[in-house]
A protein has these predicted regions:
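The feature marks proteins involved in alpha-glucan
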Residues: 1-24, 50-135, 141-161, 167-168
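Substrate-binding/active-site clefts of carbohydrate-active enzymes
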Residues: 137-201, 208-334, 355-361
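C-terminal beta-strand-rich structural cap/linker in extracellular carbohydrate-active enzymes
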Residues: 31-33, 592-618
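Beta-strand-rich binding/interaction modules
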Residues: 29, 36-48, 53-54, 82-84, ...
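Carbohydrate-binding surface patches
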Residues: 14-16, 26, 553-586
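Active-site-proximal helices and loops of the catalytic beta/alpha 8
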Residues: 239-248, 256-257, 262-273, 327, ...
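Conserved, mostly hydrophobic/aromatic
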Residues: 29, 136, 195, 205, ...
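Aromatic/acidic polysaccharide-binding cleft in carbohydrate-active enzymes
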Residues: 139, 382-383, 435-471, 487-525
Length: 618
């Protein structure tokens, strides 16, 4: 039986994906005549406590050999999630979502399709679309001022830049992350030409605010750069110098918790006698929950006593972060291009909306990104479905689902499965959000991509097993080929690619802290960097990579063949995971060869002969 319905196919659903509130959606069915008489109805329900299913009778559009065609147009008025299936109104049959997103006939309840409806005025920064990001873990990128003294006596300086980060527990069994390799803002400034040479447009920096660990997610002072990294003035200089290279800087904002060792909480007493922990009359006391039912006597992030949680709805905290002259305002006016919100799905929607207001008050082109590990449209939290991607909160999110699908594909997952997972995210996310989603293969929170691709899975084994491991020889060589394929996909999917520092030279490492080694500046691995530079140049020159629709043409036998269809140009990408050369037909009718473990990208002007531009990176 042919496909009855597939929301990825423009014949069955237009427009593709999420829609703005008030927009009309056209849905069509193709019913084989062997099913007999049917009277199909669209059954649509908005998710909400008082919302009920609404039945829309579909009109008969005519026949083709052995098939009857039906359609319906509906206007979706309010932002939210809508779910739908089709009732045939005969013999209790319905059409529900089956494998590969195709509709199947069922006599029972089944999976529905989703339509995300977002705010009609939702816009995201145009300056982000079509660009390239690069993530830097500041302590581990480049030491611009060498052998500088430690600003606090409890910091341990690591002069050997090839050393493995500390991983052994201390005498109490804890990990204090107290080893510092000395990376700083000056080091980033020095490497701006290197970054621009790779086509980087934006830097995403892990936290730079004063904090007493090398990762700096335990903020001690929101308004000052950590003194080991530099000064506030040096940050402003970095922003100005980066702008000369066409590079913006996005900061990491950690607003769900502070450090216990901070001027706000001050459990350790580093900041005198003030702070919420030591002074019941502290202006910061209301930011925290003190109660004997909690370990340590206060609520902390996932039970880590060094990370006391804040009440994000406390008026004084909200004003401190989002008010005029507050944290967001201060850093954007110092030159930052935007913020990435750490653990965004643990922040209340109302707080995120206030952060958005603060960001956009400075400029609509300032960027607000959220850390969300799953499909951001379907996340639950605070006892309700999260709304931060519907137009009043985040601009977009970190795209972990793409990362997982791409890495699994280059390792051997069926191409069709990867394509369906990617299309599902594209379908669910509002267009302004998917076009600015941050696509990556590695981060400071995950194993490095080359390790995932080429090395043995850790499978829950501890740091002692992970320490010192790396692949060499044939495994390394094949891993680099697969990594190149993976980045070719990441650079050409909807969204913006983000390269994690060191991936371009094949750095390896399992999870924290092994994925956070110092950048190996004396590495001789040069094969991936020119490819990434070419891919960045392609993104900059082809408008289809800004907002072009994704259409999968073939996903089978280790072949992933898809298009990005723009207003004036169409890019066609063929990735060949197989071990033999393939000859693949293009949409234009021509054919192209693609090498084993290789990819080909063809760009043509819409309405003209192909090969306006031709890229074949073998």
């Amino acid at each position: 039986m042919s496909c009855l319905f597939n929301s990825y196919d423009p014949y069955f659903k237009q427009p593709f994906g999420a829609v703005r509130a008030g927009q009309t959606v056209h849905l069509a069915l193709c019913i084989p005549e062997e099913l007999g008489y049917v009277d199909p109805h669209l059954v649509l329900q908005k998710e909400g406590k008082y919302d009920v299913p609404v039945h829309y009778r579909m009109k008969f559009d005519g026949q083709t050999p052995h098939q009857n065609h039906f359609s319906v147009d509906v206007v979706l008025g309010d932002p939210g999630l809508y779910f739908y299936y089709f009732d045939l109104y005969t013999d209790f049959r319905r059409i529900v979502r089956g494998a590969d997103n195709c509709g199947v006939v069922s006599w029972q309840e089944g999976e529905s399709w989703q339509i995300t409806v977002y705010e009609p005025d939702f816009q995201t920064p145009e300056c982000i679309k079509g660009k390239v990001f690069y993530q830097i873990f500041p302590d581990r990128f480049c030491e611009g001022i060498e052998n500088k003294p430690m600003p606090f006596p409890d910091r341990l300086y690591q002069a050997d830049k090839h050393a493995e980060p500390f991983w052994q527990p201390n005498e109490t069994g804890g990990h204090l992350n107290e080893d510092y390799f000395g990376g700083d803002l000056e080091g980033i400034r020095i490497k701006l030409p290197y970054l621009r040479e790779m086509g980087v447009d934006y830097l995403y920096l892990n936290p730079i605010f004063e904090a007493h660990s090398n990762h700096r997610y335990n903020t001690a002072d929101y308004l000052n750069v950590d003194p080991l990294l530099g000064t506030n003035e040096e940050f402003e200089v970095l922003c100005r110098e980066a702008a000369k290279y066409g590079i913006g800087i996005v900061l990491d904002g950690v607003f769900s918790h502070t450090g216990s060792d901070s001027r706000y909480f001050n459990r350790e007493g580093r900041y005198g006698e003030g702070g919420a922990y030591r002074d019941p009359n502290s202006p910061y006391r209301s930011w925290y929950d003190f109660d004997s039912k909690y370990k340590g006597g206060y609520r902390s992030w996932w039970g880590f006593e060094t990370l006391p949680e804040v009440n994000e709805e406390t008026p004084s905290f909200v004003e401190f972060i989002t008010g005029e002259g507050g944290v967001i305002d201060t850093w954007l006016r110092r030159g930052a291009a935007g913020f990435r919100l750490d653990v965004a799905d643990e922040l209340p929607d109302a707080f995120i909306e206030k952060i958005r207001t603060a960001v956009k008050r400075v400029s609509p082109e300032k960027f607000l990104l959220g850390e969300v590990w799953e499909d951001a449209t379907t996340k639950f939290g605070f006892d309700h479905r999260r709304t931060y991607l519907l137009g009043k909160g985040l601009d977009s999110v970190m795209n972990y689902p793409f990362k997982n699908s791409v890495l699994d594909f280059v390792k051997g997952k069926p191409a069709q499965q990867a394509a369906n997972e990617i299309l599902s995210i594209c379908e669910h996310y509002p267009a302004p959000a998917i076009n600015t989603a941050l696509n990556f293969l590695s981060t400071h929170d995950t194993e490095r991509a080359l390790t995932v691709i080429a090395d043995e899975p850790a499978n829950g084994r501890g740091r002692e097993w992970q320490s010192g491991r790396s692949v060499t020889g044939e495994a390394y060589e094949e891993g680099m080929l697969r990594l190149r394929m993976a980045y070719a996909i990441i650079y050409t999917l909807p969204g913006v690619p983000c390269l994690y520092y060191g991936d371009e030279i094949g750095m390896q490492g399992y999870r924290d802290p092994f994925n956070r080694a110092f950048f190996c500046w004396d590495s001789h691995e040069e094969r991936l960097r020119p490819v990434l530079a070419q891919l960045a140049q392609l993104r900059h020159s082809c408008e289809a990579f800004r907002t072009g629709e994704l259409r999968v043409l073939r996903a089978e036998d280790g072949i992933l063949h898809y298009q990005r269809i723009g207003k004036t140009e169409t890019a066609e990408i063929i990735v060949n995971r197989s071990e033999h050369i393939i000859v693949e037909p293009l949409a234009s009718g021509k054919h192209t060869e693609v090498n084993p473990m290789g990819f080909t990208i063809v760009v043509e002007e819409n309405g003209h002969n192909p090969n306006h531009s031709y890229y074949d990176i073998q």
